[in-house]
Amino acid sequence: MEQLNEIIAQIDDFVWGPVMLVLLVGTGIFLTFRTRFLTWRNLGYALKSTLSKEARTKSRGEGDVSPFSALTTALAATIGTGNIVGVATAMVSGGPGALVWMWISAAFGLTSKFSECMLAIKYREINAKGEMSGGPMYTMKKGLKNKTFGAVLAWLFALFAVIASFGIGNMTQGNSIAGALHSTFSVPTWVTGIVITVVSLLIIVGGIKSISKVSSIVVPVMAIFYVICGMIVILGNISNLPSGLAMIFKMAFSVKAVGGGLCGSIVASMMSAMRFGVARGVFSNDACMGSAAITAAAATTDNPVRQGYINMTGTFWDTIVVCTITGLAIASSGVLGMTNEAGEMLTGSDVTIAAFKTILGTSGGWLVTIGITLFAFSTILGWEYHGEKAFEYLLGTHKFNMIYRVVFSLVAYLGCTQTLSLVWNFSDIANALMAIPNLICMLLLSGEIAKDIQEFQSEIHSC
């Protein structure tokens, strides 16, 4: 088993290596140019639409949930432990300059997220239960000219999505919650497992309407809560912020390895900052993965482009706002390069906790733990819907969705109580493999994306 785990880990490192990252960001760059930078030029319109009263209603078009609820449900799956743990890991491994490359990947990820969500709504279907069913698998099946090729891509995407939903969308999140609560509050992992299983089942059993109802409340509250706490830390260390920002940009674009200052013993170059920043940026904002498009397809809208813009802002909120707060809190606190009692360099959540403790004391650790718990739990809810719809596509019927919901909730208990590195690595591979069919689909339909977004310009100009 240990040898198998080693092999799977090596495959995981390969599929998430430089080639995949170049493909992910490269597709975003290509689509941004192909659409004439309209996603950047219309970001203000997208944010305004997201925060409008109309986005919270189902008054325009057909769908299962409001445009805002579709976004928050997608964000529930997107804003996760990566926003706290992932950012810290990137800044330790690639230096603080990794934060800049997270921003760059997010900038081009806006167009990727817009494209996959817009296409998902355009090619969605209504199932026998009267609910919307959509996502990259339906886009591939209905949108690609070669139907056989499209059907194969769709089946592969759905299969990998189901596998990823149980791993990266469920067990890894449950393990993060259990670990955080145990280390901070000494809560037994089995107790956390039972609570997560029961609470998630109570929400999930109600389907997308129940999940979106909870997400539309929990996601904004938890994000605002975390941002406020992070801002307090940043303002408390405001005297260090200028030098922290200077080091962020210096290490982001320095050809030679540099370090020192607020970075402690960390030394990094542009290449390492780029590698870890882009990787964590993609992991965090989920652009090109295709999962957010599954939720977008449930939105009530009269135009796929309109909802594409709304769902596109998920990348903005996730990376440009939440990840930035974590990054600046760490950069201004001087905790990078610090070691623990054993002489080991702090990494992951320990770095973020140390940063928050510089101003908030012991309560800073509690707040980060609460943040990890809320972020990870919301990820479980969002990923359940993604996996359920992929499962429905594979079987060709919605009749077994309830079985999936129950099994998904029970698996969360295993994630909280067991160490399943083999399953996690395998699901991480599945998450990467989801992207390949999705990237191919978006590139083949790039002309259609460019045409639709250009035609919608008249609607924006009339606002």
Question: Where do the language-model regions lie?
Answer:
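Selective recognition of specific alpha-helical transmembrane segments in multi-pass small-molecule
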Residues: F108-E116, I194-I208, V219-S239, M271, ...
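Helix-loop-helix module between adjacent transmembrane segments
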Residues: T27, L31-T32, S105-G130, P136-M137, ...
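Membrane-interface loop-to-helix entry segments
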Residues: L23-F30, R34-L47, F157, G174-L181, ...
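Extracellular/periplasmic helix-exit of transmembrane alpha-helices
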Residues: E116-R124, A128, C229-F249, V255-S265, ...
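Flexible loop linkers connecting adjacent transmembrane helices
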Residues: F37-V65, T89, G94-L99, W103, ...
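Alpha-helical membrane segments and immediately flanking helix-loop junctions
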Residues: T57-S93, L119-G143, L156-V162, C263-F316, ...
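Transmembrane helix-loop junctions in multi-pass membrane proteins
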Residues: Q3-L4, R34-T39, G82-V87, S165-A178, ...
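N-terminal alpha-helical transmembrane segments of multi-pass membrane transport
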Residues: M1-T81, M91-A98, G109, S409, ...
